[in-house]
Amino acid sequence: IRVSRYCANNQTVEVLVETWDNWSLLPKIDFSSEGGETDYSIGIADDNLLGSGNQIQLDYAKDNERTGYLVSFASPNIFGSHWNALTRYADNSDGESYHFTLTRPFYRLSSPWAFSLDMEKNREEISDYLLGDEVNLYERQLHWFESFVGFKLAELDNRIHRLNIGFTLNDTNFQQTDFTVFALPPDRNLSAIWLEYQLLVSDYRKLFNINQFNRVEDINLGWQARLRLGRLQAWLGADDSGWQLDAELAKTWQLNRDTFLLGNSRYQALWLSGTNQQLFSNQLQLVHQLTNNSSAVAIIN
């Protein structure tokens, strides 16, 4: 950045800003051998394709369970907008998967609305093992579609309230193979419509080496909470009527100048006729910045 011209009559200056792109094409080679089995993967990844900001990944991998390749393309801001997209395709010896996402997030605290569309189709073989030996093999197929629109409700001081309205198509079924020995798991369809409330207490800091190396990150030290309540719907394909609950709470604490504690708790529940399933998970991540280029991280799940 340098001053290129000074205008004395109005006491202003013209500033020339020069930017350049770093070479971001990274090759990937991974090789290992254990117990007479050789695993390897090769590929390339570029986080700034031709200076466009788009990301591409090409991988080919082989291990003792499968062989396959992966192609992924992501655009974090399509044509300079606040929309972002991800397209990914994987073809493996035991199945294949497609994934597409189109999102306009709440890209700033004052954003009035958001939108998301997420589609996934996946087919894979599942193996059951006993004492290290494969004893059963069957196929699982997943069809997933989720979309929602979100609205900002209110902003009081540094507290932002939001409401998301959406639906999820979630259909999983199982198929026999020539090596299926045991009974298949039951097919399930948990398609639902839902409402989600979000609370964000804004206390953002620009930090370094927290979740990513050599990048400045906007980390929120305020509380973040969300509560989603869904109702399973037969007209969407659900097997049964029932309710879904998904609640999450997150917070980051700065213990001292170089030490941070990131906490996340989540509760999930599914209520069907005669069925009650609940899951609680918790994660703590302790980050201590050693230097400007390195951090020590400890994670407890």
Where are these regions (language model features)?
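Short secondary-structure junctions
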Residues: 1, 80-81
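A broad, low-specificity signal for short, low-complexity segments enriched in glycine/proline
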Residues: 18-20, 33, 48, 64, ...
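Transmembrane beta-strand segments that form the barrel wall of outer-membrane beta-barrel proteins
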Residues: 24-33, 40-42, 46-48, 52-63, ...
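Secondary-structure transition/capping motifs at alpha-helix termini
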Residues: 50-51, 79-80, 255-257, 289-295
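Active-site gating/interface segments in enzymes
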Residues: 281-285, 295-301
